[in-house]
From Swiss-Prot:
UniProt GO BP: aerobic respiration; electron transport coupled proton transport
GO MF terms, alphabetically ordered: 4 iron, 4 sulfur cluster binding; iron ion binding; NADH dehydrogenase (ubiquinone) activity; NADH:ubiquinone reductase (non-electrogenic) activity; quinone binding
Functional note: NDH-1 shuttles electrons from NADH, via FMN and iron-sulfur (Fe-S) centers, to quinones in the respiratory chain. Couples the redox reaction to proton translocation (for every two electrons transferred, four hydrogen ions are translocated across the cytoplasmic membrane), and thus conserves the redox energy in a proton gradient.
Binding site for [4Fe-4S] cluster: 37-38, 102, 132
Keyword Metal-binding included in the entry's annotation: yes
Disulfide bonds: none
Manner of cofactor binding, per the entry note: Binds 1 [4Fe-4S] cluster.
Catalyzed reaction equations: a quinone + NADH + 5 H(+)(in) = a quinol + NAD(+) + 4 H(+)(out)
Keyword set, alphabetical order: 4Fe-4S, Cell inner membrane, Cell membrane, Iron, Iron-sulfur, Membrane, Metal-binding, NAD, Quinone, Translocase, Transport, Ubiquinone
Gene Ontology CC: plasma membrane; respiratory chain complex I
Protein name: NADH-quinone oxidoreductase subunit B
Compartment(s) where it occurs, according to its Swiss-Prot or TrEMBL record: Cell inner membrane
């Protein structure tokens, strides 16, 4: 947390934005939206070796309990309305991580008539994690980048 100033009497001054964003980065609750093989790597990231719980990241089963959606895998046209519906059920503020080449831009199945060429056509994406499939380390790096993005945002309307 960045502290803007320390007064000589022992007081610490900072902005409310900084405090709110700092607390949000320590308690991200992602909802898994696993569609294909990238979901296995997402489960790998939540297992004992990488243990996302140590960063305050706890996977939630319901969109109403989560604030981050990780879209992992090939998004087809039939699943696109369900993705948008689940995204709309999430509480504000909400963020989206697109994991893997298929979620980012269609991947190997890019030219198929049934594939959406990137989940960013359906929901706004904050962080893209490349790879086919991306490793658990890449997902962890993407989550850290999302935390850095959250720290830089202004939360209070001026």
């Amino acid at each position: 947390m960045s502290i803007e100033g320390v007064l000589e009497k022992g007081f610490v001054t900072t902005t409310l934005d900084t405090v709110i964003n700092y607390t949000r980065t320590g308690s991200l609750w992602p909802m898994t939206f696993g569609l294909a093989c990238c979901a296995v790597e997402m489960m790998h990231a939540g297992a004992a070796r990488y243990d996302l719980d140590r960063f305050g990241i706890v996977f939630r089963p319901s969109p109403r309990q989560s604030d981050v959606m990780i879209v992992a895998g090939t998004l087809v046209n039939k699943m696109a309305p369900a993705l948008r519906k689940v995204y709309d059920q999430m509480a504000e503020p909400r963020w989206v991580i697109s994991m893997g080449s298929c979620a980012n831009g269609g991947g190997y199945y890019h030219y198929s008539y049934a594939v959406v060429r990137g989940c960013d056509r359906i929901v706004p994406v904050d962080v893209y994690v490349p790879g086919c499939p991306p490793t658990a380390e890449a997902l962890l790096y993407g989550i850290i980048q999302l935390q850095n993005k959250i720290k830089r945002t202004n939360t209070i309307a001026r």
